[in-house]
């Protein structure tokens, strides 16, 4: 049977230990901070990146160069292995499109998947992908199963700082100023892989109650398998979430990590990404 190799980028919020233990090859994004370049999770950690945001420094994220994908695909596929390359949403970054272009330029057998997600929403797809590969499932069937899995995943983002949305052009300076004065915390979700702002909360507690309501509607009669929380230096907010969700949904399995710079660069210090995987 042909060997299958998994490739992804640095935005899944899965631990380095998990990625290494499962032989997942990571092609990282790049970060620019006040003009200086860094390789995500290599030259700088998520925690260190958030410190720069707290200091209101100019930060940007960049997709990997096409040459990095070409080199990786050629090396990994030279023995005839199949490569399954899964990446953050094409609605959030050009990474998927670059990976796909690279796959068309090499002799290796590469299948590129748009996860239409990020953070633990991408991470849960990778974890499922790992199990499917271990079971010997064909690549074409894996693509179908991941498409089905995405229907059972919901991602919410609670914005930490409106300044980052202003810099990114998602809201006007006037709306941002008013929002900051009123201490509004916008909440967004992914719609076909694109971030859409859907609600404005005034306090942490009101944001938690909104999330609880939306999660209950999403899961319906199903149980929750896992909740992933990626936060930008607000562990006390995470603790509040867990307390409310434990009472409401009897959740036993949480995955918690500091959020990927691709999210925190746009949502600011104090943000969280909340991912729900239902059974």
Swiss-Prot record:
The keyword Iron does not apply. InterPro entries: DegV, DegV_C, DegV_domain_contain. Residues 4-278 form the DegV domain. Hexadecanoate binds at residues 61, 93. Keywords: Lipid-binding. It holds the Pfam family DegV. GO terms for molecular function: lipid binding. SUPFAM superfamilies: DAK1/DegV-like. Transmembrane segments: none annotated. PANTHER family: DEGV DOMAIN-CONTAINING PROTEIN DR_1986-RELATED, DEGV DOMAIN-CONTAINING PROTEIN SPR1019. NCBIfam families: DegV. May bind long-chain fatty acids, such as palmitate, and may play a role in lipid transport or fatty acid metabolism. This is DegV domain-containing protein SAV1425. It comes from Staphylococcus aureus (strain Mu50 / ATCC 700699).
């Amino acid at each position: 049977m042909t060997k299958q190799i998994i490739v992804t980028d640095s935005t899944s919020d899965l631990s380095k230990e998990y990625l290494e233990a499962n032989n997942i090859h990571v092609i990282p994004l790049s970060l620019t901070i006040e003009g200086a370049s860094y390789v995500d999770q290599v030259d700088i950690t998520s925690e260190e990146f958030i410190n720069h945001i707290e200091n209101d420094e100019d930060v940007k994220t960049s997709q990997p160069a096409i040459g990095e994908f070409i080199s990786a695909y050629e090396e990994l596929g030279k023995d005839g292995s199949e490569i399954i390359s899964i990446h953050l949403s094409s609605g959030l970054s050009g990474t998927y499109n670059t990976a796909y272009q690279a796959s068309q330029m090499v002799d290796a057998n590469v299948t590129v998947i748009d996860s239409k997600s990020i953070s633990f929403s991408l991470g849960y797809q990778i974890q499922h992908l790992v199990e499917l590969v271990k079971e010997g499932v064909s690549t074409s069937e894996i693509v179908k199963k991941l498409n089905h899995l995405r229907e059972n995943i919901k991602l919410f983002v609670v914005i930490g700082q409106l300044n980052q949305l202003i810099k990114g052009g998602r809201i006007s300076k006037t709306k941002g100023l008013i929002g900051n004065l009123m201490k509004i915390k916008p909440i967004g979700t992914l719609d076909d892989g694109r971030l859409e702002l859907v609600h404005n909360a005034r306090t942490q507690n009101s944001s938690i109650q909104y999330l609880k309501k939306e999660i209950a509607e999403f899961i319906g009669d199903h149980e929750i398998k896992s909740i992933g929380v990626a936060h930008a230096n607000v562990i006390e907010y995470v603790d509040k979430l867990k307390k409310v969700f434990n009472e409401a949904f009897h959740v036993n399995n949480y995955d918690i990590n500091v959020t990927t710079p691709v999210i925190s660069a746009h949502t600011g210090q104090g943000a969280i990404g909340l991912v729900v995987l239902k059974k």
